[in-house]
Swiss-Prot record:
Keywords: Cell cycle, Cell division, Chromosome, Cytoplasm, Guanine-nucleotide releasing factor, Mitosis, Nucleus, Repeat
PROSITE patterns given in the database record: RCC1_1 (PS00625), RCC1_2 (PS00626), RCC1_3 (PS50012)
Name of the protein in question: Regulator of chromosome condensation
Any single Gene Ontology cellular-component annotation: cytoplasm
Lineage, opening ranks: Eukaryota, Metazoa, Chordata, Craniata, Vertebrata
Amino acid sequence: MKGKKTLKRTIAAEESNGTSDVKKTKALPIVTHPSHGTVGGQVLTLGQGDVGQLGLGEDIMERKKPALVTLTEDIVQAAAGGMHTVCLGASGSIYTFGCNDEGALGRDTSEEGSEMQPGKVELAEKVVQVSAGDSHTAALTEDGRVFVFGSFRDNNGVIGLLEPMKKSMVPVQVQINTPVIKIASGNDHLVLLTVDGDLYTSGCGEQGQLGRVPERFTNRGGRKGLERLLVPQCIHLKAKGSGRVHFQDVFCGAYFTFAVSQEGHVYGFGLSNYHQLGTKNTQACYAPQNLTSFKNSTKSWIGFSGGQHHTVCVDSEGKAYSLGRAEYGRLGLGENAEEQSEPTPIPDLPKINSVASGASVSYAVSTDGCVFAWGMGTNLQLGTGEEEDVWSPEQMTGKHLEDREVLSVSSGGQHTVLLVRKRS
């Protein structure tokens, strides 16, 4: 990523609706990243939906099998938050449904039942990527700006979004001077990857997931206050010799972060109490660690997804791996599996394109468009129709999957979202 210049912008006063009027001093580039969705499809949801996160209306509180969500255009990305869902349309518009207590839907839901079905977020800019956490949502525009709505929380409650103790019910712009090319959300933290290969983080840092805040300051920012946490700041990681490490990709677990350097090295920071980062010990990492457990593979890593205490990942050869906590079958390594401190191949899977995880569940999407699921069955997120835990990968079936291929999966606290399209 050479020759990119930092762009300076003049930021005008925020309008009363909460969005910023940004006067650009030069034309901004169209940002690209392999993670941006480009193939349009339909959205299926399953699991528990008592606060509307399934998007199926007021009368449907759960679905044992994937159900079709009614949307007005093709969807190129679907992201599951803790208790809400975010869909990105092919036009660049955002549709949300689910819990709006902290503003994670980014729209007015005062009309009874309006949060239970998809509604459009008012944002003039064309969006190319979305991410969702427990009670926040982020949107990346085609010119590299980031808008957020909702709030971050820590163990004591709401901490705010961009300002201390202030949530936002509508999109507000993140002030960062360099175009962003990818966004990723954990439960209560946000990571921005810039065109220059830098990582900016914001949100809760209690478990080290921001990668830039020492442990003594993670409790609401210490004497510097919440601004230390909520204002996105760059992670400065020195490289061997001179300069610093630059990154090409980033992924979030619930309370931890993975980042891949431009040289292909895997770094991690945050909670690792079950070795979910691939560290030898179970201490939290408050600064990026070069994870040697991922060097044991000669392949390049192309995808990571972290639950509460486990991680699933996939390499460039289409092989899926898991590590971390084993209870309830979330690793997919069989009923007698134990905690894993390094990436462990998941048996009985075909060639895989992508992986996903919820708190205690995991998914893998094969190159031929099938989805496999395993882990805790309590919330009906696995598509088996039963509440039993699944210890090894099982292919998900259902009426709406018979003639459709799965493009991607995203999983929240109690529900799961599939992006699918008709098989040609």
